[in-house]
Structure formats: C-alpha cells, structure tokens
Design a protein with these regions (language model features):
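Short hydrophobic core segments
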Residues: 12, 100-111, 237, 245, ...
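A Rossmann-like FAD-binding core segment of flavoenzymes
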Residues: 72-87, 178-287, 291-293, 342
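FAD-site-proximal beta/loop scaffold in flavoenzymes
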Residues: 122-151, 243-246, 252-324
Length: 419
C-alpha cells in the first residue's frame, strides 16, 4: 500500500501489456508503479522495418515517461526485477530495492527460444528487442560495405541472409530484406549481382503460415519468390556458425547473417515462482487473467497462456493480444479499487496478418474471411497504426511508409560508429 493509504498497483514490464494496463489505470484511486529494465516502450511488430531502414528508431521506441507523463498517479522506474514473492506480495529489484504491492500486473514478456540449436545464441540475430533490430541493421550495412571493399567476401556468402521461421515475423523480415537488397542495395553497390546476395527463408514444418488457409500460404510463397526469396520448408536448422548455417538434412547454406524468427518462450523469471508452466514457459491464467490462487496477480502479454473463450485455443503471442490483456488487467483493477465487479477477459480478434513487401500482404480473420494484396496491406497498416501509442507516432509512421512507397528511399541507411 502507498504511504497515503491508496492501494499500490505494481506493473512489471513496459511493453504492450504493461503500458495498456497503465493507461486504463490513469484515473484510478491508486498509486501505479511501472518498472521496466529499459526506459522505453518497444513497438515490436515493426522491428523488422527498423532493421531494414523503413522506419527510424524513434518510430519504434518510445520513452515510457513521455507516454505516461499525464498520469498523475503513475511513476516509472528503470530497474531489473530479481524476484517476486507471491506470498508476501513483494518484488525485489537491484536498483531500487523491494516494492510491495496490493495488485500486481506481471507483463515481463518473453525471450527468444532457440530450441537448443547449437551456435544460435551466439551467432543468430533475433528480432524481439530494439537493440536486436538496430544491431541487424548495422550488420547488414557493414556486410555490404565490407564486400564493396573486398569482393572476395561475396564468394564466402557475406551478403547472403538466412531467415528462420515461417510465421509472420520470419516472412515479414525475409520479404523486407529481399526488397532492401533488390532495390536500394543493388543500386548503391553496382558491383554486386543479384545472385551474389541471396535471401533464404527456412521453416522446419511442412509449410509456411500453418495457421493460414492454403490459398494464403500459396500467395505468401509466390510473393516471396517474386521478391527473390528462396523458400525451404521441412528444413530444420542443426547449427549456426558465423559464416554458414547447417540444416539437419545435411545441407549447408553459406551466409554471414542468420535472422531468428522461430519462436519465443516466457520470461525466465517465471521459473522461480513455483508455478506449473505451460508450453513455452508461459503461465496459465483464469478467465479474468488472474493467477489461480492469487486473485491480486494478473499475468498478461507474451508470458501468459490465455485461453480464448470462443475458440478454447491458447491465444498467440501477438501485440494485439498483449495490449488487450494489459488493458483488461488495468480496467479490472480500477473496477476493484472502486468497489465494482470486473468482467472476464474477451479477446477482440483483429485478424492474423503479415505484410510481405510493397503491395503484398495476407490477412485472415477469425470468422474465416481473407484478404490479399493492397487491400490486405491497408488492413495491416490500419491495425498496426492503431497499436502505436500516440498520434505523433502514427503520423510519423505514415510519412515514412509513404516516402518509402513513392520514392523507394529508406530513412535509416547509415551506421554510427565510434570515432
């Protein structure tokens, strides 16, 4: 409880779920404390656009303090959570010490799951955090600059990219890198031929987009091929080295870049809570998103295994799921503080979607309706613009997207190095 007698709501994590919870608590008669190891919120669905120069860092990363600056009942701390004691209702932090709580919103997200693949943690480029995307952007530019200085590197696969994962993250990333290569880079580096810079998408399963209808999978495959992406299904990665990728089939792909978009697992802190975890290190929750046995604890976002009441399926780790679950937690706590009865969580499906490149996208709604092409890309843009936290961010994204579409010029195409 806060020093003034108000209940304290502790929000762990400043992602979609944490920020969504804080926004719904803005007018609650409570002290709201949001803690994240970073001082910024990351818009994860657009990280691949940062990595390929379609958007600037400021369009993907947003100051948490700025986002919540109008919340008079909210404070933000930059700190790393060490432990959570569910019985004592207390969280421990290295930087700010212990914090007790009356309500806890556990939204610490996930981390990349390499599935034990040898060499992947050391050599792969994940696509889950702002530093991940910035590091990949600099690496891609550096490889082309290195090959421009020393063309013999091309034969070693310096410009080749392997993208792992046939879901939305992998497909969007592969399509964006292929367009970057076939468009801007081949123009800027005239000594490189298209066949010298290959983009390969590998998926361990028998097909891309297993959650989509066959016609959408076929469309995605054709759109990737049209952009120069080689698609390999039934191709599991055995190991990763700095300059090559070995598949379990025995095939070796020469490549200095491997982007990992193959899966996530819940934040490792959950393993210390003494809970029975579900697949992918995720925490099972009740219909109201509270932790069974702990009605004051809400688990939300990528770390939560939320069963959809309509389909009885566990909801995917998507930005829309994280945001809606966080908003539900914040709204429920605000109701409880005011003496009102909260409602069960009901997910409003925005569709599963991916954009593959300029004018190419796929959308599948919960009821089975599908879209492809420019219409699907417009729907994709509308959904993602709605997820952006401020109108300023939405306007900036539209300007950057429009500039790339009409001029084929990208905004983020320099590397900043130490003098």
């Amino acid at each position: 409880m806060a020093s003034d007698g108000r209940p304290r709501v502790l929000i762990l994590g400043g992602g979609f779920a944490g920020v969504g919870a804080a926004q719904k608590l803005q007018k609650a008669d409570a002290e709201v404390v949001l803690v994240d190891r970073h001082d910024y919120h990351t818009f994860q669905p657009l990280l691949y656009q940062l990595a390929t120069g379609l958007l600037e860092t400021t369009a993907v990363g947003h100051s948490l303090r700025d986002l919540l600056s109008r919340h008079k009942n909210t404070v933000v701390h930059k700190a790393q959570v060490k432990a959570v004691d569910l019985e004592e209702r207390r969280a421990e932090f290295d930087e700010i010490g212990p914090l007790s709580y009356d309500y806890l919103v556990f939204g610490l997200g996930a981390e990349v799951n390499f599935f034990g693949t040898a060499g992947a943690p050391a050599h792969a480029f994940p696509m889950y955090t702002l530093p991940h995307a910035a590091r990949l952007k600099d690496h891609l530019l550096e490889r082309w600059e290195a090959a421009d200085r020393d063309p013999s590197l091309i034969e070693d696969g310096a410009l080749n990219v392997v993208v792992v994962g046939g879901g939305p993250t992998g497909i969007e990333t592969a399509g964006a890198i292929a367009e970057l290569y076939r468009g801007d880079f081949l123009k800027d580096y005239p000594g490189v031929a298209p066949e010298d810079a290959r983009v390969t998408l590998v998926e361990a399963g028998p097909e891309l987009f297993p959650m989509f209808k066959p016609k959408l999978r076929e469309y995605a495959d054709e759109a990737l091929t049209l952009r120069g992406v080689e698609v390999k299904t039934g191709a599991a990665v055995a190991s990763v080295e700095p300059t090559r990728v070995a598949l379990k089939s025995g095939e070796t792909l020469p490549a200095h870049t491997l982007v990992w978009g193959a899966g996530l697992q819940g934040n490792p802190l959950v393993q210390s809570l003494g809970l029975e975890l579900q697949r992918g290190n995720r925490v099972g929750v009740g219909a109201d998103l509270t932790l069974p046995g702990y009605p004051e604890v809400y688990v939300v976002g990528d770390v939560a295994a939320i069963t959809d009441a309509k389909t009885e399926q566990v909801l995917p780790q998507l930005g829309s799921v994280a945001l809606q679950s966080g908003e539900h937690a914040g709204e429920s706590i605000a109701h409880r503080v005011a003496g009102k009865q909260p409602k069960p969580f009901e997910y409003k499906d925005k569709g599963t979607m991916a954009t593959i490149g300029r004018g190419a996208a796929v959308v599948q709604m919960l009821g089975g309706k599908t879209m492809t092409g420019k219409k699907a890309q417009a729907a994709w843009g509308a959904v993602h613009l709605a997820l952006l936290p401020t109108n300023e961010d939405r306007a900036k994204a539209v300007v950057d997207w429009a500039g790339a579409a009409f001029t084929h010029q990208r905004v983020g195409r320099i590397t900043v190095e130490a003098d």
